[in-house]
């Protein structure tokens, strides 16, 4: 019996089996690129007003005038980045046909772990090489000075688009390096050329945490993106499915379910498109004729599991210990969490970091969404912030299970 089974298993290499299916099997997806969040469609549905407002705000740059600083708000998946990138793309096409010294610079603040890295990203897109702007080693003030000089000497009209600018504000708060304030005052130091800031934020309350001086300069104009309705998401999905899948491959009920699931999450079109993509990939792997509701439900589970697991595994050791301390403390204050963290360090033989540093890590983990904090009132003792996990403890245990240092305390 075992010999027969072994022979059956070795009849065909498992890699070849998968590649044969990919090469010769059924394919329901004909253009995967259209299901990526980076894809910019020619038509962005239900965002005509927002496109007009952002374009009006940025269009003075084509007349060699400085556009007003702009803040773009809206929850994730409401089309903010898509609209801004489309407009930048169209402006760039016109710039190429002229001799205007215009630079459109885009960066996502969350992709950079330090303020230095963020400023270097701006510099590279302005054309500064490693000699002119080293990847490390300069003071923040010197990096900023070199950015201003590049704009000034090139007589450049520059637009810095900062996606997830709320994360930059968090970095500023953490390092006490007021880069946002310096960026908003940069034009006072630029004799030739100009700098405009476009900030994109998922956090509608973000500006309430800004220094009033920064807010005044940064929000010269504002555009708010409302949530998509379920019907609007359905129309977006129909459009993408028609281009990305072979005709008739996606059932109407599957599209409805994708739209309904995304609609429950504040109208997140990005999640809806991601669901459709993963559901399509699962249908192909199963050699199915098309995408069904079952594929969509399976895709939703897979996306959630992968997202949380990957994020948890990526944390450094001491942030993992802080997360475990929150899990063990169950809704406790920073002081109680720090006490548990110290005990976990003792059990794992790790050097204990200061309470200030541990509290900072707790704030970083909260920002990433793995824990949530809530202010509670405690009578004469005033207010305190209580923290709890936003993911199931079982997910944490699974993600940290391969870490040999943590194995004995999970």
From Swiss-Prot:
- Which UniProt key words apply to this protein? ATP-binding, DNA replication, Nucleotide-binding
Keyword Chaperone attached: no
User: GO molecular function of the protein, one example?
Assistant: ATP binding
Single Gene Ontology BP annotation: DNA replication
Family annotation (InterPro entries): AAA+_ATPase, AAA_22, Cdc6_C, Cdc6_lid, ORC1/CDC6, Orc1/Cdc6_arc, P-loop_NTPase, WH-like_DNA-bd_sf
Keyword field contains ATP-binding: yes
User: One Pfam family for this entry, by name?
Assistant: Cdc6_C
**Binding positions for ATP per the UniProt entry:** 78-82, 228, 240
Protein family (similarity comment): Belongs to the CDC6/cdc18 family.
Q: What does this protein do?
A: Involved in regulation of DNA replication.
For this entry, the protein name equals: ORC1-type DNA replication protein
């Amino acid at each position: 019996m075992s010999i027969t089974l072994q022979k059956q298993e070795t009849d065909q290499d498992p890699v070849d089996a998968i590649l044969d299916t990919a090469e010769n099997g059924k394919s329901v997806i004909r253009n995967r690129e259209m299901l990526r969040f980076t894809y910019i469609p020619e038509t962005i549905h239900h965002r005509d007003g927002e496109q007009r407002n952002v374009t009006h705000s940025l269009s003075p740059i084509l007349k060699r005038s400085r556009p007003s600083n702009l803040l773009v708000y809206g929850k994730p998946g409401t089309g903010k980045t898509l609209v801004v990138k489309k407009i930048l793309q169209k402006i760039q096409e016109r710039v190429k046909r002229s001799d205007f010294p215009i630079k459109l610079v885009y960066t996502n603040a969350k992709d950079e772990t330090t303020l230095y890295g963020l400023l270097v990203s701006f510099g590279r897109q302005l054309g500064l090489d490693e000699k002119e702007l080293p990847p490390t080693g300069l003071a923040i003030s010197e990096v900023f000075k070199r950015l201003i000089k590049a704009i000034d000497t090139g007589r450049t009209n520059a637009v810095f688009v900062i996606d997830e600018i709320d994360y930059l504000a968090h970095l500023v708060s953490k390092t006490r390096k007021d880069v946002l304030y310096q960026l908003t005052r940069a034009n006072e130091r630029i004799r030739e050329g100009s700098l405009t800031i476009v900030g994109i934020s998922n956090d509608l309350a973000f500006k309430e945490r800004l220094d009033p001086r920064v807010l005044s300069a940064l929000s010269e104009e504002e555009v708010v993106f409302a949530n998509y309705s379920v019907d609007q998401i359905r129309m977006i999905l129909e459009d993408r499915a028609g281009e990305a899948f072979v005709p008739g491959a996606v059932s109407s009920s599957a599209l409805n379910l994708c739209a309904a699931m995304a609609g429950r999450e504040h109208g997140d079109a990005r999640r809806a498109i991601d669901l459709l993509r993963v559901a399509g990939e699962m249908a192909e792997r199963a050699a199915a004729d098309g995408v069904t509701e079952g594929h969509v439900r399976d895709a939703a589970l897979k996306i959630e599991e992968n997202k949380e697991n990957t994020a948890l595994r990526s944390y450094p050791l001491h942030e993992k210990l802080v997360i475990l301390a929150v899990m063990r403390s169950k809704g406790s204050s920073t002081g109680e969490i720090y006490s548990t963290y110290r005990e976990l360090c003792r059990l794992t033989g790790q050097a204990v970091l200061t309470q200030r540093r541990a509290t900072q890590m707790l704030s970083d983990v909260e920002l990433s969404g793995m824990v949530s904090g809530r202010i509670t009132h405690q009578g004469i003792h005033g207010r305190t912030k209580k923290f709890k996990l936003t993911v199931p403890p079982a997910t944490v245990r699974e993600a940290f299970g391969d870490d040999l240092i943590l194995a004995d305390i999970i």
